[in-house]
């Protein structure tokens, strides 16, 4: 969606400084189509992979104008986002607290078409660039002090974030 907004509306795109090269596609830390096809024997994986491909999941375009979200820029944005680096899904992945809401991105999800259950959890390991690091990063989220979680996939979760982290790491 960020690619579309940037191209269509010239929307500025900000992310953690460590994620900027990834957003610009200087490199790509994403599951490969070959790795997905190796999972085709699993229920739902082939259908999901085909749907994602039709929705542009194979597009490798970056966002050339991506800029680092510095504290100075964050101060000028609605909600004044505060960065919580959560590397693992990608090496520069970052979650943000905005207006007392944790926007976790892919650090923690509450549902996914390939997940076996709903509720706080980590993505299947093949979707993380460094799965052990992704799991360690969850501890940082537990300190967010918010009661609302917006995940990268799944429904909004309301409750102590420390509880969400416990469920995700169980």
Stretches found by the model and what they are:
Residues 1-19:
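Active-site metal-binding motif and surrounding structural segment of the metallo-beta-lactamase
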Residues 3-7, 27-30, 99-101, 117-119, ...:
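Short, glycine/charged-enriched secondary-structure capping and boundary segments
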Residues 10, 64, 124:
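Short, flexible active-site loop motifs that bind/organize anionic cofactors or intermediates
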Residues 13-14, 68, 149:
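Short, hydrophobic beta-strand segments that form beta-sheet elements in well-ordered domains
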Residues 17-21, 108-110:
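Short, acidic/turn-prone active-site loops that include or flank metal/cofactor-
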Residues 20-87, 91-161:
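Metallo-beta-lactamase
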Residues 41-45, 149-170:
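C-terminal/domain-terminus segments
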């Amino acid at each position: 969606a960020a690619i579309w907004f940037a191209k269509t509306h010239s929307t500025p795109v900000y992310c953690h400084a460590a994620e900027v090269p990834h957003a610009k596609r200087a490199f790509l830390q994403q599951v490969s189509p070959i790795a997905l096809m190796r999972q085709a024997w699993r229920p739902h994986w082939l259908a999901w992979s085909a749907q994602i491909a039709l929705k542009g999941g194979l597009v490798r375009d970056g966002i050339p104008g991506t800029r680092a979200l510095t504290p100075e820029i964050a101060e000028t944005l609605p909600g004044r986002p505060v960065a919580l680096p959560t590397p693992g899904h990608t090496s520069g992945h970052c979650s943000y607290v905005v207006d007392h809401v944790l926007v976790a991105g892919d650090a923690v999800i509450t549902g996914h078409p390939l997940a076996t259950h709903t509720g706080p959890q980590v993505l299947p390991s093949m979707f993380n660039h460094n799965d052990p690091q992704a799991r360690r990063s969850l501890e940082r989220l537990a300190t967010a002090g918010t009661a609302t979680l917006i995940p990268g996939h799944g429904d909004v979760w309301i409750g102590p974030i420390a509880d969400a982290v416990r469920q995700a790491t169980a």
